[in-house]
């Protein structure tokens, strides 16, 4: 709970903003003293679906749109532009969109005896896994197409990000018809075999190749993501074991 500080003074609502703010009425309070509220109450919702339902009922003032609620809230036209569905507009809900520069990734434990280290064997395993995990498919299924597959740690809009062929991850992608194209899974399977695991088994012992994933995720939405990820590893005959941690 945040309450008004009786000793705060001297700040007013801005009179300038982004293009379109004035037309949207966001600058109507120009010059008025802040804050406008006496108290702000914040609560934490652990699950996305209950949070979304409470937002629709008016318990929350703002909400992001999860993949589970995307079709209910947003429609996409043939040009790729997004707009609220009629149901959302009737509730008086407004859609605010922006381009967010951020990066999320899954990392390898470089101390792991199987996929860690800088030996040619472990390096090829990491490369094979990177090719096999189809990030384009992940974005399409779980993020409703909102995002692009990373080519480096730098997202678009950050200084140093390179566009075009010179900016692609050539280990995972080829440059085809003016855009990056993920290498076929056959390349990943070949790398696994070159690492000493033909058909996903150690060529010396015959033991299956097992990779552990430590994750803090939970809930129904997370299970579907982990099931999808398990299938990605299975494409190159690698067994993925998910280990939940605190």
Model-derived regions: residue spans:
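Gly/Pro-rich hinge or "lid" segments in bacterial periplasmic/extracellular proteins
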Residues: 1-41, 49-50, 185-186, 190
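Sec-exported extracytoplasmic/periplasmic mature domains
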Residues: 7, 56-60, 113, 125, ...
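Surface-exposed intrinsically disordered loops and tails
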Residues: 14-35, 76-86, 90, 119-120, ...
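Ligand/substrate-recognition segments at binding pockets and active sites
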Residues: 15, 32-34, 42-51, 180-185, ...
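Extracellular/periplasmic solute-recognition and catalytic clefts
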Residues: 19, 28-30, 41-112, 136, ...
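Stable alpha-helical elements in mature extracytoplasmic
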Residues: 48-51, 66-70, 104, 121, ...
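Structural transition elements
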Residues: 115-116, 148-197, 215-225
């Amino acid at each position: 709970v945040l309450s008004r500080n009786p000793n705060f003074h001297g700040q007013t609502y801005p009179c300038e903003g982004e293009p379109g703010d004035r037309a949207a009425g966001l600058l109507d309070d120009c010059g008025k003293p802040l804050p406008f509220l006496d108290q702000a109450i914040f609560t934490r919702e652990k699950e996305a679906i209950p949070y979304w339902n409470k937002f629709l009922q008016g318990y929350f003032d703002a909400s992001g749109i999860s993949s589970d609620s995307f079709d209910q809230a947003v429609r996409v036209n043939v040009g790729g532009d997004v707009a609220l569905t009629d149901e959302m507009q009737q509730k008086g809900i407004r859609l605010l969109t922006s381009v967010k520069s951020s990066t999320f990734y899954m990392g390898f434990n470089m101390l792991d005896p199987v996929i860690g280290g800088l030996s040619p064997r472990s390096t090829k395993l990491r490369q094979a896994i990177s090719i096999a995990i189809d990030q384009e498919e992940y974005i399409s299924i779980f993020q409703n197409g909102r995002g692009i597959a990373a080519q480096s740690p730098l997202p678009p809009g950050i200084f140093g990000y390179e566009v075009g062929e010179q900016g692609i991850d050539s280990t995972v992608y080829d440059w085809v018809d003016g855009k990056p194209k993920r290498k076929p899974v056959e390349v990943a399977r070949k790398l696994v075999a070159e690492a000493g695991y033909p058909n996903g088994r150690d060529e010396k012992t015959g033991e299956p190749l097992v990779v552990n994933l430590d994750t803090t995720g939970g809930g129904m939405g997370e299970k579907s993501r982990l099931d999808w990820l398990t299938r990605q590893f299975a494409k190159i005959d690698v067994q993925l074991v998910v280990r939940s941690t605190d």
